[in-house]
């Protein structure tokens, strides 16, 4: 698929995915106006919002009005609909389970130095070890944000970026979300992708920057079109956000990456793809955590809005006779002064069988229990689809201080299973991205790549909950008593965040302390049989 040259935008073959991205983006953002726009304009492509009268009356063309957000509010009344940010919570928790504690990058086992205590220790870290340490500090925020958006949209992409003006000594990873990419796969592998960015909207005019990635090469194009059309290609120098590229590209508006593969790594949220399993261009995309539960999001908002309406309608009100009202002047109506002590005589009879009270109190009931139970039931179904535990969202109360693994491990087994599935994909993505970044740095002769041999690092994910120190200590004690683990293994278990140097020093201290407590050995030559 070469660089697009015009026509519909996004291209027709990507329409199913982009319609879904539009909906998932609206739920993720949680803006009521955006949700109303999406569900009052159900089409394959985004376009200018409009309101159809049939949406107010129902009917065939008003099917979307069955959604809470599919019926526009009346222009002469306050919008009673409220949104609960459950979709945003799902995406955030998904990312927190993976990357709340940053992953660590280390040399593969076959590349690590020997752990023989008698072997000489290296004076300093090797260049590749130092580069991995730097990346461990550089990428955690990128991964955390990427995982959150991937949970909402079904995936994201990591690309290796070289900008010698911003970062003269090294390349860095950047992220492109699924709704800014047009990928092409073969046998489940990404073979090319076009990233696009909307640079400017001026009335009907839309300026888009396209970035087409193929193995070893990136081509750029600036297009002047509309919201529905890509339009004509114009020079990169015609927009301030693209003019810097004009100094980098060759005669074909592209540049070489220096490596033979794509400078992009796709990052699917989870698989398999259910919605587009038989659609050629979308079958290899990741699956969103929102997929299939959009009606439940809408139902939760409907029940919550109904609850709030009950509160509004349940406000205490009073009905007073006309004689209690005082005129506010010609054409300005009348009002009642609740602080007034003396009123004129009443030209009315008291209520039959009631007290001689001319004020009637109106107070409607508020269905608290019914609404709460319905919201809870819908919330449980929302969590069931992407496979999360209620305890992960603090549904049983939050205790003071960090929660230990012993306290919540059994209750959150479902969430941990989902985390492990996502971690399998994320681990491969990180390994591929780091190796690709090192290869680009070496090919581009950047200072950070000198002396660094590209490799796939070992990636270790942090614990999503705090390990229980007592349980860890008891486990280590049992292993030691059973002679089932070495001192080094026990130190690594108790201190999983320590590096190799810290572990070596601790092992030496323990062995020295153990040796100091041992009784001295007797000299065998001093033994006498007749003693």
Where do the language-model regions lie?
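Extended, helix-rich architectural segments
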Residues: 1-201, 521-531
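Extended, charged amphipathic alpha-helical segments
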Residues: 244-410, 447, 460
């Amino acid at each position: 698929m070469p660089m697009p040259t015009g026509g519909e935008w996004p291209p027709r073959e990507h329409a199913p995915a982009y319609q879904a991205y539009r909906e998932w983006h609206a739920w993720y953002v949680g803006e009521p106006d955006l949700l109303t726009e999406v569900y009052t304009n159900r089409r394959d492509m985004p376009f200018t919002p409009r309101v159809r009268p049939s949406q107010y009356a129902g009917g065939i063309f008003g099917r979307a009005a069955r959604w809470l957000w599919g019926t526009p509010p009346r222009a002469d009344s306050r919008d009673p609909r409220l949104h609960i940010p459950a979709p945003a919570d799902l995406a955030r928790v998904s990312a927190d389970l993976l990357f709340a504690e940053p992953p660590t990058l280390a040399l593969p086992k076959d590349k690590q130095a020997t752990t023989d205590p008698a072997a000489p220790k290296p004076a300093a870290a090797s260049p590749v070890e130092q580069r991995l340490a730097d990346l461990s500090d550089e990428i955690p925020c990128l991964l955390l944000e990427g995982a959150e958006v991937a949970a909402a949209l079904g995936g994201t992409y990591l690309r290796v970026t070289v900008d010698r003006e911003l970062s003269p000594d090294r390349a860095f990873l950047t992220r492109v979300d699924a709704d800014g990419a047009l990928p092409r796969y073969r046998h489940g592998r990404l073979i090319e992708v076009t990233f696009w960015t909307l640079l400017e909207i001026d009335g009907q005019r839309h300026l888009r920057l396209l970035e087409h990635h193929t193995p070893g090469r990136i081509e750029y194009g600036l297009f002047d079109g509309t919201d529905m059309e890509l339009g004509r290609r114009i020079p990169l120098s015609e927009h301030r956000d693209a003019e810097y590229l004009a100094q980098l590209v060759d005669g074909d508006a592209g540049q070489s990456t220096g490596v033979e593969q794509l400078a992009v790594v796709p990052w699917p949220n989870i698989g398999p793809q259910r919605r587009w399993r038989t659609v050629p261009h979308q079958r290899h995309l990741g699956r969103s955590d929102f997929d299939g539960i959009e009606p439940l999001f809408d139902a939760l908002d409907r029940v919550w809005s109904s609850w709030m309406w009950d509160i509004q309608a349940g406000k205490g009100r009073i009905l007073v006779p006309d004689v209690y009202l005082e005129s506010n002047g010609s054409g300005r109506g009348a009002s009642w002064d609740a602080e007034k002590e003396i009123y004129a005589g009443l030209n009315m009879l008291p209520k039959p069988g009631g007290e001689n009270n001319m004020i009637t109190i109106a107070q409607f009931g508020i269905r608290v229990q019914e609404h709460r139970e319905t919201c809870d039931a819908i919330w449980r179904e929302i969590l069931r689809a992407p496979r999360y535990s209620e305890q992960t969202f603090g549904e049983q109360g939050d205790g003071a201080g960090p929660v230990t693994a012993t306290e919540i491990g059994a209750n959150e087994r479902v969430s941990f299973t989902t985390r492990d599935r996502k971690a399998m994909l994320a681990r491969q993505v990180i390994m591929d991205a780091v190796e690709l970044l090192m290869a680009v740095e070496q090919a581009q002769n950047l200072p950070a790549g000198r002396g660094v041999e590209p490799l796939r690092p070992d990636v270790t994910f942090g614990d999503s909950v705090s390990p229980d120190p007592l349980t860890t200590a008891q486990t280590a004690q049992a292993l030691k008593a059973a002679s089932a683990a070495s001192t080094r293994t026990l130190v690594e278990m108790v201190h999983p965040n320590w590096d190799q140097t810290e572990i070596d020093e601790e092992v030496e201290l323990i062995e020295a302390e153990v040796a100091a407590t041992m009784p001295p050995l007797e000299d065998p030559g001093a033994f006498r049989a007749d003693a």
